[in-house]
């Protein structure tokens, strides 16, 4: 659908009809390609987890700062995907409980995450930490002023209901692979949030943070770990494959009636490829990183205060 830019407000929104997100997830039938890709990644990831344990070697503080650096790079890369600037420091990340208290989510926490990314970036959202009050569409604006609308976000009257359903999906436990496997659940958490598009700006950035929360929670459940920060961050990889990333999302109808299993599987396979790339990159990085010497400057009592020590303990215990 093409319209001149000054006519965009005259478009009649083709917004998705309200439906239950767990039902969307349960309709997914994994392709042979995704299942094969997944088994290969799991084997590589388990080797990577062993390497993490070897590098930690009982020194929790050093590993904390290593992962804080990784978290900082992830947030910056996530902003770069939509050409935003992101400015913050490890100290700011540790100053609040946004990332350390829990891997669970709620509508309040999602709004707090949105507020965090808006306050630390050049976000254009006029409603910081609040759901949008206007229709939202995703597409292209061309040099001649024409507009191509790819898809519409949820109707503003349905956002709260969609988000309630989203929380139910996020928390759902099931033996089905789409819920039980951390890689798949995280990828679908990312997709569904973007498709709801609850905020006026920052939906992609929030979705990638939620993906990391979901992934970390899933890894803890499957491997009996107690991580609070994601052991894999794929925004750098997404940024390098941005055209495919956008196409995979745009190709998926956000609907039960028009559900497209092949399109969803292409999205899952894309995200698995991003994780696969990151596993190999991080494996080599950890092998070539002397964590103790790299972070020695951080270990001063003058730098690590009592509050931060408390968070360090929460991170690993």
Outline where the language-model segments fall.
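FIC/Doc superfamily catalytic core
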Residues: 1-200, 204-317
């Amino acid at each position: 659908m093409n319209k001149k830019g000054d006519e965009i407000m005259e478009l009649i929104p083709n917004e998705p009809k309200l439906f239950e997100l767990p039902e969307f997830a349960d309709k997914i039938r994994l392709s042979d390609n995704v299942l094969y890709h997944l088994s290969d990644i799991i084997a590589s990831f388990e080797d990577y987890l062993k390497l993490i344990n070897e590098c930690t070697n009982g020194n929790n503080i050093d590993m904390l700062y290593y992962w804080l650096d990784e978290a900082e790079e992830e947030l910056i890369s996530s902003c770069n995907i939509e050409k935003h600037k992101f400015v913050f420091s490890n100290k700011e990340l540790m100053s609040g409980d946004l990332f350390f208290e829990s891997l669970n989510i709620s509508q309040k926490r999602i709004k707090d995450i949105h507020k965090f990314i808006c306050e630390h970036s050049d976000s254009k959202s006029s409603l910081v930490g609040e759901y949008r009050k206007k229709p939202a569409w995703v597409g292209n604006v061309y040099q001649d002023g024409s507009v191509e609308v790819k898809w519409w976000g949820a109707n503003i009257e349905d956002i709260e209901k969609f988000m309630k359903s989203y929380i139910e999906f996020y928390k759902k436990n099931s033996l089905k692979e789409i819920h039980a496997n951390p890689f798949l659940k995280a990828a679908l958490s990312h997709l569904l949030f973007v498709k709801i598009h609850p905020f006026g700006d920052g939906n992609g950035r929030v979705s990638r943070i939620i993906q990391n929360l979901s992934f970390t929670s899933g890894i803890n459940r499957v491997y009996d770990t107690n991580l609070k920060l994601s052991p894999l961050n794929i925004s750098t990889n997404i940024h390098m494959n941005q055209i495919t990333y956008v196409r995979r999302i745009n190709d998926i109808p956000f609907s039960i009636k028009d559900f497209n299993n092949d399109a969803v599987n292409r999205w899952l396979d894309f995200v698995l490829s991003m994780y696969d790339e990151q596993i190999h990159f991080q494996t080599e990085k950890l092998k070539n990183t002397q964590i103790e010497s790299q972070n020695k400057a951080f270990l001063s009592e003058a730098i690590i205060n009592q509050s931060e020590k408390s968070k360090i303990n929460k991170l690993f215990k």
